[in-house]
Amino acid sequence: MTHVLRARRLLTEEGWLDDHQLRIADGVIAAIEPIPVGVTERDAELLCPAYIDTHVHGGAGVDVMDDAPDVLDKLAMHKAREGVGSWLPTTVTAPLNTIHAALERIAQRCQRGGPGAQVLGSYLEGPYFTPQNKGAHPPELFRELEIAELDQLIAVSQHTLRVVALAPEKEGALQAIRHLKQQNVRVMLGHSAATWQQTRAAFDAGADGLVHCYNGMTGLHHREPGMVGAGLTDKRAWRSDERRVGKECLRLCRSRWSPYH
């Protein structure tokens, strides 16, 4: 079965295309092509791929950490209404048993599926941070990095744990990063007072980037570039919602690496 979706503007990896259509055959995009001359009907003003939201704590009045059976379904529907096709429910620093329970719920939802945006797995943000840039994370619940504990978290998640955020200056951080990467878990750096050197060492060990660049980390100084400086020299290391970081600062990030800034 073939059908066509026509849009005034259509987003592709090459940028926006005006007055183009998708030709879809058996659920697969078969062609991206100009709308024939004389066809005035448009199915959408703007047409683009669904987003993948890799860091979601909550929304629609609920939180990923809430111990209720319908929380993840509510969030999945909320994300779908925002144009998100898949997402990573993200935990926060909490007692270890509370984190385990959240990871178990996410794993079950990931495996059984359900309405709304697809759950791709879990994102562990905390408790492996340091107090100087703790943000909303309670420092009394921070923990040291131990390989056995990380393996337990992976097991509890039924191997659906996709990302772990940690502070790279913590004892054992580099070993933990290498181990997590061997387990196919991505590592982000944040809520940290790490130096430029410590951050670069973490990247060299396999860390994938910074979690909320500029926020929750050592700032940029002309004599000590800090985590922000390390991030600005590595294209993997930033993301922003333009609320916690000014647009001009975000433009600085983009100008380092993106042809579309």
Task: Identify the meaning behind each predicted range.
Residues M1-C48:
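Histidine-rich, glycine-flanked metal-binding segment
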Residues R8, L22, G27, A44, ...:
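Divalent metal-coordination and catalytic microenvironments
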Residues H57, D73-A102, A117-T130, S157-E169, ...:
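Divalent metal-dependent hydrolysis catalytic cores, especially in the metallo-beta-lactamase
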Residues A68-V71, A102-R105, E146-A148, R223-V228:
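Charged helix-capping and loop-helix junction motifs
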Residues T130-A155:
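Conserved phosphate-binding/catalytic loop of the ribokinase/pfkB sugar-kinase fold
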Residues D151, A155-K247:
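Active-site core of metal-dependent hydrolases
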Residues G246-H261:
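Positively charged, low-complexity/disordered segments
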